[in-house]
């Protein structure tokens, strides 16, 4: 088997990833310009990305009596100060506007008898959001001069002299290669799951918090192209209902359930109420012999029972089925909780591309938005949309500039370079497709499991209670590099398996950068998220960003000063 031909396409804007941020960016670009757009989506935009199964709340909203600055302060506190306040503020100022636009497109937002949105806490409003992604996808599909290419797996940027020219990939179904040239490129590929050994084994390994199909592709392409990354050491670990990995917020906020240990003691206030502290408290209670830990639902009303079962049917039906199977309602049994494996996701933590306030990366012409963009945690759905809108507006502005300078190289030089890189990638695709089983040592799945075990054991996974030390990280680095070498001899029987090969390569690249970040921050600022046993205390000396950039095959660490309230960062060095 081999690659089935080559399609060369040209567009004004290439959007890689048709999830929340990517789709919303496309709507904004077409609303404000006549620019042509190609959206390259690995799955199908109707049900792809984090919104695939729907959501029951907008978790980032400025409710009545609050202001955008309040949201900035909340996110800053949760991240213990390691945030970009300029990014948080520009996002927060748009949260309500993008929500209103989604309502106009058909999203059902619950309202009280006075016509006001029904709040769920200080930053959330309730919605009927099972169909939120199809609503967004339908709006994109109705746009003129927008081509959506589903089942297209982008593997590489085309970057010359730190300027992006487009991207290369292949169709998972047809095996056709694609070289897409664009004036501007937006990366909206989501975060990275599957780096660590998951909660559940075997067939159920993808029963996880974050989409298992988000494999860090955008991160890996940026890393390999020399883009600067930030704060990967701020991993995200979700506190979830045990086994089903269903959300806990619906119970905690919906019925006011507290975290309790097996003795019935409320322990959450003992450790703190930030996201990482809630996970850490649960871990410590189990280590110290007071587990299992639960959300206390015993004693809630029958109406609350029904409300919870209906809510979970809408977004995590396995939790409702578990209640039914046990023969007990939530009011009759507490809900056991556990932490997930760690993820790299810029929508909840500050990890991702280092961007300026317009969401430009350090590669000229390349933007990042949503879970792939760093510095701006607690984005959730509306924050991803806001970042897509911010990037889109700057893209339109740049495309409309009459004084725009040409690249330092000619069009013919750019064409020659792009074609050469595309030919190299097609050759690489074919090497994986043509390699027979007898010529490879391990399958892609075996290598993925090996990678996850290494990260779990030596880089702070579930088995080590999310803890690590420098000696362990050194071993993790060595072993991940060994697995990366073995991955070069992987093989694929078809185009779908070829995608798995590249997903493995993407994860390995992200793992290497993550390990360097965990090593570089010599403190424990976020319990569980980055629990460094060699440096168990927090220090003001580390009130700074840990950034990295791959240069000549090596990952270089760079420290940057915090961007505080009233400050704005623009790329200069």
Whereabouts are the PLM-identified features?
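Core beta-strand elements of the Rossmann-like FAD/NAD(P) dinucleotide-binding domain
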Residues: 8-11, 174-184, 362
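Glycine-rich active-site loop/strand segments that organize a redox cofactor
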Residues: 59-91
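N-terminal Rossmann-like FAD-binding beta1-loop-alpha1 element of flavoenzymes
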Residues: 13-39
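Glycine-rich loop(s) and the adjacent beta-strand/alpha-helix scaffold that form part
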Residues: 187-246, 381-394
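Long, amphipathic alpha-helical stalk/connector segments used for oligomerization, subunit docking
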Residues: 400-493
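Mobile, glycine/GP-rich and aromatic-enriched active-site lid/loop segments adjacent to catalytic centers
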Residues: 96, 103-155, 231-380, 385, ...
């Amino acid at each position: 088997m081999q690659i089935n031909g080559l399609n060369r396409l040209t567009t004004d804007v290439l959007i890689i990833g048709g999830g929340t941020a990517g789709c919303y960016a496309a709507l904004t670009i077409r609303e404000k310009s006549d620019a042509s757009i190609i959206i390259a989506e690995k799955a199908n935009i109707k049900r792809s990305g984090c919104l695939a199964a729907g959501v029951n709340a907008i978790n980032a909203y400025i409710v009545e009596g609050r202001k955008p600055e309040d949201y900035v302060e909340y996110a800053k506190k949760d991240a213990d100060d390691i945030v970009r306040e300029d990014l948080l503020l520009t996002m927060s100022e748009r949260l309500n506007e993008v929500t209103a636009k989604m309502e106009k497109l058909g999203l059902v937002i619950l309202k009280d008898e006075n016509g006001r949105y029904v709040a769920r806490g200080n930053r959330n409003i309730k919605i009927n959001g099972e169909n939120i992604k199809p609503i967004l996808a339908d709006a994109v599909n109705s746009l003129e001069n927008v081509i959506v290419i589903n089942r297209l797996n982008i593997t590489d940027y085309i970057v010359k002299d730190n300027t992006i020219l487009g991207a290369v990939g292949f169709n998972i179904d047809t095996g056709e290669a694609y070289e897409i040239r664009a004036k501007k490129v937006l990366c909206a590929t989501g975060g990275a799951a599957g780096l660590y050994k998951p909660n559940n084994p075997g067939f159920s390994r993808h029963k996880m918090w974050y989409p298992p199909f988000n494999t860090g592709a955008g991160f890996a392409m940026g890393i390999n192209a020399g883009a600067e990354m930030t704060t990967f050491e701020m991993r995200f670990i979700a506190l979830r209902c045990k086994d089903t990995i269903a959300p806990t917020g619906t119970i905690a906020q919906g019925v006011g359930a507290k975290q309790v240990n097996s003795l019935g003691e409320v322990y959450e206030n003992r450790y703190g109420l930030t996201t990482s502290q809630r996970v850490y408290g649960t871990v410590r209670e189990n280590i110290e012999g007071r587990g299992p830990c639960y959300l206390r639902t015993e004693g809630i009303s029958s109406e609350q029972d029904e409300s919870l079962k209906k809510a979970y049917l809408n977004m995590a039906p396995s939790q409702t089925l578990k209640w039914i199977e046990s023969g007990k309602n939530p009011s009759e049994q507490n809900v056991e909780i556990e932490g997930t494996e760690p993820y790299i996701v810029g929508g909840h933590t500050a990890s991702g591309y280092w961007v300026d306030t317009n969401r430009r990366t350090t590669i000229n012409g390349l933007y990042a938005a949503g879970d792939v963009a760093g510095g701006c945690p607690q984005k959730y759905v509306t924050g991803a949309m806001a970042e897509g809108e911010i990037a889109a507006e700057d893209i339109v502005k740049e495309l409309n500039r009459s004084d725009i300078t040409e690249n330092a190289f000619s069009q013919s030089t750019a064409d020659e370079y792009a074609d050469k890189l595309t030919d190299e990638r097609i050759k690489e695709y074919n090497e994986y497709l043509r390699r027979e089983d007898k010529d490879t040592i391990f399958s892609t799945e075996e290598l993925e499991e090996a990678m996850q075990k290494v990260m779990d054991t030596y880089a702070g996974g579930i088995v080590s209670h999310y803890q690590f030390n420098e000696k362990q990280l050194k071993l993790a680095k060595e072993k991940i590099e060994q697995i990366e070498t073995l991955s070069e001899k992987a093989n694929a029987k078809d185009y779908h398996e070829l995608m798995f090969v590249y997903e493995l390569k993407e994860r390995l690249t992200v793992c290497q950068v993550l390990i360097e970040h965990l090593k570089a921050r010599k403190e424990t600022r976020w319990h569980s998220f980055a629990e460094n046993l060699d440096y168990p205390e927090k220090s003001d000396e580390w009130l700074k960003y840990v950034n990295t950039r791959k240069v000549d095959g090596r990952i270089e660490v760079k420290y940057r000063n915090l961007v505080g309230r009233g400050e704005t960062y623009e790329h200069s060095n």
